[in-house]
A protein has these predicted regions:
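Compositionally biased, non-globular sequence tracts
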Residues: 412-460
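Cysteine-centered metal-binding/redox modules
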Residues: 1-414
């Protein structure tokens, strides 16, 4: 049953997690094809808002050609006597949840990476104007966040206006992110958990600390504190830290307890500052990811905005598939830009001394936070294009990773795998003569067996 019977499409939690494929798409808003897209919540005074007003700047949904994509911005202005500026980021993040409540609407990512799709069926049912979406969002916000007394929504598809407001939004995001810098995890006895993405990754939970932003890059420790106070039963909540098991890896008794509960026992331990062992899980909304390059014993890092291939031939979509889903996969680690600015970034793995490649856009955004002497030794896509060139570059720059190469990198070595023989008794096979024995040989085994040979051992 829909939450709002007077609207042309259903609205409810049942639609959260719905995926819309290209062939079913009426229109795409933002996404990887568009340079400029954003979502922003601003807290302003009560007398500045016309409560319930929805404004469209540019083409409305009915004016956008079928199957096309458009630059997109959404600005939500809120006001209330109890509304703090600290709540802006969390109210903003709720857009991910609320848009996905709408039948036939898909919302992915956050901030300047948003990606929305509307399907044809919902459009034909009457969701053919941003006015309808705006009405839904305003009702959801007011019904779940009682501290919002007034709200108005502005949708933007005009390319020039999107670009103008996008540039302002970037400045606001940066101001928010700067608040927690200088704080240490050891300064607090409470972290925060965020389960907003569990509709897409049921076993995932973000652990937010002063030195580890949410993977999406949209929720800081201060944001978590503010929202848990006004909405204690909501998707952002306190995590009592408890005893520190290992300060280097970032493992805590309290975090493990909550992770086990929220993942229904699927994830038992999490270490916040390593990509191996028990790494922090990821949904698909992370700003970027760190990926291990075994040939060089180091990490590459990239963000969603990078369009090309990495130095080992993978792209963001491929790496995202390997990283996301609420799993713990050694060597694949969902991260935010702000976490890359943290002194605890991949701390247990060697930090920036283990990073061997990144796009130049990331290098620009973390300059002034990561050690400059290391940034000077880490190449970008402008410097190298394959692993052989990367190896040469690292040697020329005397990158610290070079001193860990006690022998040739793995790709240069001939790997020999001993034959594995299993007795036939361990492999009962129906339909074969009794008394026949077999030898099972796995040749060139790595992760998968290249060849399976079954030999008869008659007479032995």
């Amino acid at each position: 049953m829909s939450m709002f019977e007077d609207l042309p499409v259903n609205v409810g939690i049942i639609y959260e997690g719905e995926r819309i494929r290209g062939r079913d798409m009426q229109v795409e808003l933002g996404g990887p094809r568009e340079e400029h897209k954003f979502e922003l919540v601003r807290s302003i005074s009560l007398d500045e808002i016309v409560d319930g007003k929805v404004t469209v700047i540019g083409k409305d949904l009915s004016e956008l050609p079928v199957g096309t994509n458009s630059p997109f911005g959404i600005i939500i202005s809120v006001a209330g006597k109890e509304l703090e500026t600290d709540l802006e980021g969390v109210i903003e993040r709720r857009l991910h949840e609320y848009v996905n409540f709408v039948e036939g609407f898909m919302h992915l990512n956050q901030r300047y990476d948003i990606h929305l799709r509307l399907n044809k069926k919902s459009y034909e049912k009457g969701l053919n104007s941003f006015k309808v979406l705006g009405e839904i969002l305003m009702r959801l916000y007011k019904s779940e966040m009682s501290f919002i007394e007034k709200i108005q929504v502005t949708f933007i598809t005009d390319p020039e206006k999107v670009k103008e407001e996008y540039e302002q939004a970037i400045k606001i995001y940066e101001h928010r992110d700067s608040r927690a810098r200088g704080m240490n995890d050891s300064d607090v006895d409470v972290f925060y958990g965020c389960s907003l993405c569990q509709s897409f990754a049921p076993t995932h939970l973000c652990v937010i600390t002063p030195q580890r932003y949410a993977n999406c890059g949209a929720i800081s420790w201060f944001d978590g504190r503010a929202t848990s106070k006004v909405d204690p039963k909501g998707p952002v909540f306190e995590i009592p830290v408890g005893e520190c098991i290992d300060e280097n890896t970032g493992e805590y008794v309290g975090v493990n307890k909550v992770i086990r509960e929220k993942s229904l026992g699927e994830i038992e331990r999490v270490q916040l500052y390593t990509a191996f062992g028990y790494p922090h899980t990821s949904c698909g909304c992370f700003e970027g990811c760190a990926f291990y390059i075994p040939e060089l014993k180091g990490y590459g890092v990239l963000t969603r905005s990078y369009r090309g291939e990495t130095v080992n031939g993978l792209d963001f979509v491929t790496l995202s598939d390997m990283t996301a889903g609420g799993r713990q996969v050694d060597g694949f680690h969902g991260i935010s830009i702000e976490y890359m600015r943290s002194p605890r970034f991949l701390q247990a793995d060697g930090g920036w001394e283990r990073v061997v490649w990144m796009p130049k856009l990331i290098k620009e955004r973390i300059t002034g936070f990561a050690p400059q002497e290391m940034l000077d030794k880490i190449p970008t896509e402008d410097d190298v294009s394959n692993l052989d060139d990367l190896k040469v570059y690292l040697k020329e720059k005397d990158h610290p990773i070079v001193h860990t190469w006690t022998e040739e990198p793995e790709s240069q070595k001939e790997i020999t795998v001993p034959q594995l023989e299993l007795p036939a008794e361990l492999l009962p096979i129906q339909g074969l003569p009794s008394g026949m024995g077999f030898t099972i040989i796995l040749k060139n085994a790595k992760i998968k067996a290249e060849k399976l040979i079954i030999k008869s051992n008659r007479g032995k």
